[in-house]
Amino acid sequence: MDIKRTVLWVIFFMSAVMLYDNWQRDHGRPSMFFPSATHTAPAAAGGASGTSATTAGDVPAAAAGAAPSTTAPAAQAQLVKFSTDVYDGEIDTRGGTLAKLTLKKQGDGKQPDLYITLFDHTAGHTYLARTGLLGGDFPNHNDVYTQLNPGSTSLTGDENTLKLSFESPVKGGVKVVKTYTFTRGSYVIGVDTKIDNVGTAPVTPTVYMELVRDNTAVETPMFSHTFLGPAVYTDAKHFQKIDFSDLDKNKANFEKSSDNGWVAMVQHYFASAWIPQQGAKRDIYAEKIDPTLYRVGVKQPVAAIAPGQSADVQARLFAGPEEERMLEGIAPGLELVKDYGWVTIIAKPLFWLLEKIHGYVGNWGWAIVLLTVLIKAVFFPLSAASYKSMARMKEITPRMQALRERFKSDPQKMNAALMELYKTEKVNPFGGCLPVVIQIPVFISLYWVLLASVEMRGAPWILWIHDLSQRDPFFILPVLMAVSMFVQTSLNPTPPDPVQAKMMKFMPIAFSVMFFFFPAGLVLYYVVNNVLSIAQQYYITRKLGGVKKKPA
């Protein structure tokens, strides 16, 4: 039996099953392996309030969208537009909520004049960041704030910061002034909550900071599954992803209290995260508040505030692309929102190396090519052993077929004869298998590196490839991949089974069809890898691994 071919068939079968499983999840069906990781089918997420679950305690659940209350408000809310070098956005004076945020340096990948909108409050999509007070009838995100010192709302000229402040009405003897600080070139927003006790008795409020999002799936490459949902990070339990489906069932498992870390909403390429001050005690919550609406947040108690006194609660809000080096400098563990899945331990060093190569060549496409060359060079000894074994197996294939034909009625004698042939010719049937198996985790890791890296968005390579995160517009790379797979197949030993031989010829067609829909960066990697493999195999089999044929 050809062990290497069997291993390849197992890999092919597992790949097909995993691709089908991704298709299941992308269409809102349960995963065959991880039932809790199902993509919830996209649905309109309006602003109707839901019933607050016990997880978030008394955090108000209303005002999730543009129409938060069925009762006509006493004051009319407005949308205050602002602009910096990295953001265009809107702050809703109802709650002083950050209701819209467009990333001006991240194109939408389809139209050159449009950009990625992260936070939004349209009829079909809700994603926002908001804060408020608990512990009494204090101002929260349902109350209409007033903009203080209205004036310039744009970061212009030589200014490095833009501050926008909003004041709440007095409720429960408390007034809140919320200030957003935007810094040039930064995706980190400073959020300062000043609590003034204008009453006659001490107050002990709790500040809540939360991210609210519907379960509308973001667009990802076909046959590829990336995480969408809340996440929590603490020093004790590190990175904890929370599936929407677990929140649906009230079965989410995550750390509920800490004095460090952050909470986030994660999607493909982009994330947002509340980062409270380190050392400040806080409770952590995540819950479903509407049929299609979820939230994750923290509740941070404030020490008693005497009449006439005030307290400041400072936090940071990250909202932007999942650029690994940038995230590492913002908060511990924040780079983990860039989801490599179970291959993180290998993927992170690979991305580091890819990034270093890009620093020299200045083009992500050529960086992928050079990284693939480097990996093939590192694994050359293993590949040489594999191809030598394949070359020897190919040389003795006619003799193996003759033995199978001679002893086809007696499987035991056939196996004994084959083993004797292997021993005589010093051929290890497992010799071509182990080197391939060892390399598989590295190639899978590189796949996830290229799939998860926002740096590929809008990154050109050459000529017709203008965006490595999008599929090849002319399908040139998938065709080249199919051709390279056919060439590889022709270099391998011919399977003795005619049916198996036909299936091996069909594999390049099946894989090339799938790769027609893969991002160009991924296909580029596989094409280069195949071409290098062909060159290695040809060189080794012709120059190093040749064996003279012997009669059966």
Swiss-Prot record:
Entry keywords, A to Z:
Cell inner membrane, Cell membrane, Chaperone, Membrane, Protein transport, Transmembrane, Transmembrane helix, Transport
Q: How is the quaternary structure described?
A: Interacts with the Sec translocase complex via SecD. Specifically interacts with transmembrane segments of nascent integral membrane proteins during membrane integration.
Identify this protein by name. Membrane protein insertase YidC
Membrane listed as a keyword: yes
- Please name the CDD domains in this protein's record: 5TM_YidC_Alb3, EcYidC-like_peri
Which HAMAP family does UniProt cross-reference here? Answer: YidC_type1
Q: Record's PANTHER family?
A: CYTOCHROME C OXIDASE ASSEMBLY PROTEIN COX18, MITOCHONDRIAL (PTHR12428:SF65), OXA1 (PTHR12428)
What Pfam families does the record tag this protein with? 60KD_IMP, YidC_periplas
What is the species listed in this Swiss-Prot or TrEMBL entry?
Burkholderia cenocepacia (strain HI2424)
What gene is it encoded by?
yidC
The record's GO CC annotations read: plasma membrane
* Protein's job: Required for the insertion and/or proper folding and/or complex formation of integral membrane proteins into the membrane. Involved in integration of membrane proteins that insert both dependently and independently of the Sec translocase complex, as well as at least some lipoproteins. Aids folding of multispanning membrane proteins.
Q: Which GO terms describe its biological process?
A: protein insertion into membrane; protein transport
